[in-house]
């Protein structure tokens, strides 16, 4: 493994452990030419999100959407940043304008469900969440603790008691 690839792999590992400063150190040691790589941008984005630096993260996610318009990841992250900045209606719109490949991701349906719940659109929320749970049953466990779904908690539990 070349040094840049080793550093990128190390940075990914640090992000997974929540060690954002260490991940940034690995990325900082990369040659300048590597900073434009999609995987490096994604790791930087995850660091910003982990540090709750939502505006910077959104700007980087939007850049990723422009660079990789067919890839769903940038759209999911950008919408999440908007939601965290209390711009949930914009988050819904952003995801709605994303590529068709988004609709293959359970995270798309889960996040749409959360955003609709936050806006009080409970029936729409439940429909999106049900689709997410069909695609990835583990999301049901996550939903039990998700504060965005507090208003729907009893209905979600009743559906699968």
Whereabouts are the PLM-identified features?
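A conserved position within tetratricopeptide repeats
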Residues: 31-32, 65-66, 99-100, 133, ...
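"A position-specific structural signal for the A-helix of alpha-solenoid helical repeats
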Residues: 9, 43, 77, 111, ...
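TPR/TPR-like (Sel1-like) alpha-helical repeat modules
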Residues: 117-141
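Terminal, low-structured helical/coil segments at or just beyond the last alpha-helical repeat
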Residues: 134-161
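Register position in tetratricopeptide repeats
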Residues: 16-17, 50, 84, 118, ...
């Amino acid at each position: 493994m070349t040094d840049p690839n080793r550093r990128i792999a190390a940075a990914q590992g640090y992000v997974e452990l929540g060690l954002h400063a260490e991940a940034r150190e690995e990325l900082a040691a990369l040659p300048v030419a590597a900073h434009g790589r999609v995987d490096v941008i994604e790791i930087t984005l995850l660091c910003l999100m982990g540090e709750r630096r939502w505006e910077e993260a959104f700007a980087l996610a939007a850049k990723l959407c422009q660079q990789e318009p067919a890839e769903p990841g940038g759209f999911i992250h950008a919408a999440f940043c908007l939601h965290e900045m209390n711009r949930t209606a914009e988050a819904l719109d952003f995801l709605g304008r994303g590529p068709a490949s988004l609709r293959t991701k359970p995270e798309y349906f889960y996040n749409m469900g959360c955003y609709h719940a936050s806006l009080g659109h409970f029936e729409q929320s439940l429909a999106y969440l049900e689709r997410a749970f069909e695609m990835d049953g583990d999301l049901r466990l996550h939903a039990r603790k998700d504060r965005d779904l507090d208003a729907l908690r009893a209905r979600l539990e009743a559906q699968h008691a």
